[in-house]
């Protein structure tokens, strides 16, 4: 139950002043709350008989909006002052805070972030309904079990006019002509939102009441807490309630607990336990004890210990109230008379009258205490609220950019709209091809991803050379036996050399095609993601672009694969320029001789094919040639295969995708079909625009708030 007061004219209590109504200043400082001694707050005397131009407590003449936390029940004396001065102080200090939050709530900002509020929670039969009734002056639905099943935002406005009401939920707005309609309409709204069972819902019901007989305030009533789920009630109903509002840091929790339960063990106080879960330090929880008239004799001191914060500690302390009981309601006891009886009860009670002296008892003092707490809480929350609004506004703006502008209705405008869409898409494809796209910190550019695949190709080529070396003796011996003719020992059989070269080059075809496949998948997925980024909200256009990307990819893949296979067919020719091969051969032979400790220092040893090879077997000589040729071939393939892949799968692929996109513009009859949006895109765009509008209005409201600016 969120509570906020506005300046009103109420009838004042005829009872003379007593020592039980001490003076109190209202402070709003962000310092830890004082010790939970009695804080006295003047009651908004709306349930009384004689005419008075304002219910405002006298202490409002000393209002101070410095953001200091109010003391947790520190007893003070009331001050007196002219009523017009009280009203002016209220207008200047209190009302702007309440009106600010009400205006944000009216804008619907609570859909986007939590607003400062006071929530009332309580177990079944805790007296929560009676407390709400006494605070608001409006009778809400009553009964056994959970009666409040949806949060109820109750905005009461005092005005000298006939009683009027309005209830709003979802897309339903119902005007009310009589107070007797309120209960039935609330029940009806709850059934529509939460079903006819006992389930609860987080959806808000808004009830506005305008009447000369109600206080100016705002309430948010939360569902009550049950210990065991009944009938078709969900088993996690307690968690559902906790998830509604009370876990928000912006909410002050007002926990209603009967005096006749064991608070020390919390055995029968689920509401208090739940509040402790979401607020373990008790920084934003106030305890409200009810039904003090039902306390058994001899247990009064236990209640006093609770009120003194000695049993279950809350930083904001406790207050105690006595509301109308069922018999009082049956006897149609007025709220004004109930207030007088409550005051008389505490004044005459041998144990509890000290609580009245300390300002911890009666409903009017509770109402003032809540006003104090809420105003302080609002001022404390404003800086955080401003930051949250800025962040959510920025995120909503960025999200809206993804959905783009509204589709124009004019056919000519649709052409320009589509041209712009395709232009931006083609620009992004161009950046991908050139390696100039913008990427996140943890991502890599497309060209770099492909280059990483090319690095693995180098490892494959190196591994192939090492494989030839490792099986050289076995392979050459096998081919020597098969192909050697009349050559003398030491002469190289070219057929043996050529056969080994062709065999091991042939083993590189599959790895090259696999590298092509991986590179193709990387490019294809990147192009698809880019298309989704630009066209996801246009189902037909998106599918058309995806199909074109797929078709072009398939054709480019086939061309690249054919060219790679052609490259390896040409490699079977076993060719290398003499000048290049001679240099490589000398280098390999030199390395082998050095490793064998037989390197020659004579100038002739450096001339190709002129060395005395009589002491070298044909196997060693073929090994020299194989190493030399594979080294040169690997250099050629290390660049040539990546060249083919880059050209067909990146450069030419991207160019063809860009041209295919431009061809879409030639089919003018299909513009409307191509620009047909997803079913929920327009809804999402509208939702985001409304959200941005709400948050913009909220920013303006905060900027214009005088205390926030000052």
Curated annotation (Swiss-Prot):
Region G4 motif: start-end pairs: 290-293
Region G5 motif, annotated ranges: 322-325
Alphabetical keyword list: Antiviral defense, Cytoplasm, GTP-binding, Immunity, Innate immunity, Nucleotide-binding, Nucleus
Induction (record text): By type I and type III interferons.
Main location: cytoplasm
Annotated stretches, region: G1 motif: 122-129
Residues that coordinate or bind GTP: 122-129, 221-225, 290-293
Region G2 motif, residue ranges: 147-149
SMART domains: DYNc, GED
One Pfam family per UniProt: Dynamin_M
Residue ranges occupied by any GED domain in the UniProt entry: 619-710
Segments forming domain Dynamin-type G: 112-383
Gene Ontology cellular-component annotations: cytoplasm; microtubule; nucleus; plasma membrane; presynapse
Localization per Swiss-Prot or TrEMBL: Cytoplasm; Nucleus
Domain of life: Eukaryota
GO biological process, one term: receptor internalization
Similarity comment text for this entry: Belongs to the TRAFAC class dynamin-like GTPase superfamily. Dynamin/Fzo/YdjA family.
Biological role: Interferon-induced dynamin-like GTPase with antiviral activity against vesicular stomatitis virus (VSV).
Protein name according to UniProt: Interferon-induced GTP-binding protein Mx2
Species of provenance: Bubalus bubalis
This protein's encoding gene: MX2
């Amino acid at each position: 139950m969120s509570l906020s007061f506005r300046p009103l004219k109420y009838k004042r209590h005829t009872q003379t002043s007593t020592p039980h109504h001490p003076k109190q200043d209202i402070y709003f400082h962000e310092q830890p709350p004082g010790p939970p001694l009695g804080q006295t707050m003047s009651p908004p005397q709306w349930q009384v008989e004689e005419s008075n131009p304002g219910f405002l407590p006298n202490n409002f003449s000393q209002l101070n909006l410095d953001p200091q936390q109010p003391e947790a029940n520190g007893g003070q004396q009331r001050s007196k002052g002219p009523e017009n001065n009280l009203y002016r102080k209220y207008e200047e200090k209190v009302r702007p805070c309440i009106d600010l939050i009400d205006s944000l709530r009216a804008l619907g900002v609570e859909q986007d972030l939590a607003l400062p509020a006071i929530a009332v929670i309580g177990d079944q039969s805790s007296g929560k309904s009676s407390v709400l009734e006494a605070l608001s002056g409006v009778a809400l639905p009553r009964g056994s079990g959970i009666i409040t099943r949806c949060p109820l935002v109750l905005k009461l406005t005092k005005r000298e006019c006939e009683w009027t009401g309005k209830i709003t939920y979802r897309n339903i707005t119902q005007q009310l002509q009589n107070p007797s309609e309120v209960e039935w309409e609330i029940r009806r709204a709850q059934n529509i939102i939460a079903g006819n069972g006992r389930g609860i819902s987080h959806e808000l019901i808004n009830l506005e009441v305008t009447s000369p007989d109600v206080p100016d305030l705002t309430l948010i009533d939360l569902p009550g807490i049950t210990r065991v789920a009944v009938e078709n009630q969900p088993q996690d109903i307690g968690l559902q309630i906790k998830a509604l509002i009370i876990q928000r840091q912006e909410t002050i929790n007002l926990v209603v607990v009967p005096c006749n339960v064991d608070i020390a063990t919390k055995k029968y106080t689920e509401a208090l336990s739940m509040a402790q879960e979401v607020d373990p330090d008790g920084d934003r929880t106030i305890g409200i004890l009810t039904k003090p008239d039902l306390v058994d004799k001899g247990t009064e001191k236990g209640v006093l210990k609770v009120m003194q914060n000695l049993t279950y500690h809350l930083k904001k302390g406790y207050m105690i109230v006595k509301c109308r009981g069922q018999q009082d309601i049956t006897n149609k006891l007025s709220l004004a008379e109930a207030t007088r009886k409550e005051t008389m009860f505490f004044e005459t009670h041998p144990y509890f009258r000290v609580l009245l002296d300390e300002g911890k008892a009666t409903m009017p003092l509770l109402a003032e205490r809540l006003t104090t707490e809420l105003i302080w809480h609002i001022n404390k929350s404003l800086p955080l609220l401003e930051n949250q609004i800025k962040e959510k506004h920025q995120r909503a703006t960025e999200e809206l950019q993804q959905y783009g502008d509204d589709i124009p209705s004019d056919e000519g405008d649709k052409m320009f709209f589509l041209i712009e869409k395709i232009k931006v898409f083609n620009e992004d494809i161009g950046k991908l091809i050139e390696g100039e796209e913008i990427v996140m910190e943890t991502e890599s550019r497309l060209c770099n991803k492909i280059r990483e695949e090319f690095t693995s190709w180098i490892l494959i080529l190196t591994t192939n050379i090492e494989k030839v070396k490792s099986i050289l003796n076995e392979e050459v011996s096998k081919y020597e036996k098969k192909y050697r003719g009349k050559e003398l020992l030491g002469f190289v059989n070219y057929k043996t050399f050529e056969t080994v070269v062709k065999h091991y080059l042939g083993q590189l075809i599959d790895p090259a095609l696999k590298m092509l496949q991986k590179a193709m998948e990387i490019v294809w997925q990147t192009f698809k993601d880019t298309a989704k980024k630009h066209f996801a909200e246009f189902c037909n256009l998106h599918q058309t672009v995806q199909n074109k990307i797929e078709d072009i990819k398939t054709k480019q893949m086939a061309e690249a694969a054919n060219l790679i296979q052609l490259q390896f067919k040409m490699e079977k020719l076993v060719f290398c320029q003499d000048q290049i091969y001679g240099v490589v051969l000398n280098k390999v032979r030199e390395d082998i001789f050095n490793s064998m400790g037989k390197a020659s220092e004579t100038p002739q040893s450096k001339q190709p094919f002129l060395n005395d090879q009589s002491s070298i077997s044909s196997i060693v000589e073929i090994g020299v040639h194989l190493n030399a040729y594979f080294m040169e071939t690997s250099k050629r393939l290390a660049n040539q295969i990546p060249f083919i892949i880059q050209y067909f799968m990146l450069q030419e692929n991207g160019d063809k995708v860009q041209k295919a996109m431009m061809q879409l513009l030639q089919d003018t009859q299909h513009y409307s079909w191509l620009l047909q949006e997803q079913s929920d895109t327009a809804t999402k765009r509208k939702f985001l625009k409304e959200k941005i509008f709400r948050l913009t209005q909220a920013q303006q409201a905060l900027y214009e708030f005088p205390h926030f600016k000052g």
